[in-house]
Amino acid sequence: MRKSKINKRRSKPITSFKGRGPIARKVIATAKAHLEKKVIDFANWKVGKLNAQALEASVIDHNELADFDLAHGAYVYAQNKMSVLIEQIIELPEVQKLAYAYDELMADYTPAYPPMSSITVSYFTSWATSDLVTQGAKKESLASIAVDFCRYMQVDSSLLNLYENLEQSRMGIYRHEGSDTQFVHLTELITNRKIKALRTTDYLGNVGELWFVRVLPPPFDAAHMGHHVVFTTPYVFVPNRNYDSVDKSIEEQWLVCFERIFPTLTVDTPVQAYEHFMRHGLSRNYWLEFIFLSYINHEDGAIF
């Protein structure tokens, strides 16, 4: 794989960092206690016997990454590496509630690809690590806990930057504005954010479609690689003929839906309401149920 300069937004290690939430602080405190005892192998810092070598072997190798666009490959590698860390963290008693929720939802929705399941692996993995959060004022996710631990451990800033982008990502509803060989041009509803994003499936799409996808920001400084990445298989919305406004386009139907939902959320602006809704829905399982119940059809690279 060719080398590219990765944005080193966080160049200073945070040696005194204690974590943003109570779970992360407990995880870091436990790690600190073991590190002070000179137990420096993280594989030994756990409850039970964790096979760190076997987990590390599951990370995608550089030969496989050579087939990816550089930006996409960077995120695939980062997600694989972060998954290894999460697989170890999830065994700790401090993370028990999130771990239980993760396992329960995995069993209930059995992510795969239609016709086996409309919940794709790419969707569920990102949702369960970044959007599934604890209750209370300090909402923590598996990704946020992993990122906080990496900040404390002074993980390489380039890799940490990718971890942070994964953690902070969310789904969004985008209007298809046209596509070419590699890229799709999208405009997000409500935020009106216009982006050029790498397509990561063979589905070209059609102008005017609405895509429900997780789009990641450019990871590189280089201008010629400054494109976003569509990180999940597109869910393509089609008009709801049972909707009470059947004369409206699918976009108009969603805008009416937003008008009804946003006032019920305790946020200040429509953009904040939209971002909250995209990440958390109206309940923990809201978007999983939405995808499960809304499934109509699929083709290679897109689900309707």
Describe the function of each predicted region.
Residues 176-178:
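Conserved hydrophobic positions within beta-strands
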Residues 180, 190, 215-217:
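Residues that form ligand- and interface-recognition hot spots within folded domains
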Residues 182-186:
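Short aromatic-glycine-enriched beta-strand elements
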Residues 1-172, 204, 217-304:
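Mixed-charge, low-complexity intrinsically disordered regions
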Residues 188-197:
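Short, structured beta-strand/loop micro-motifs enriched in basic residues and often containing a Trp
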Residues 198-214:
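Short nucleic-acid-contacting surface segments enriched for D/E, G, S/T with interspersed K/R
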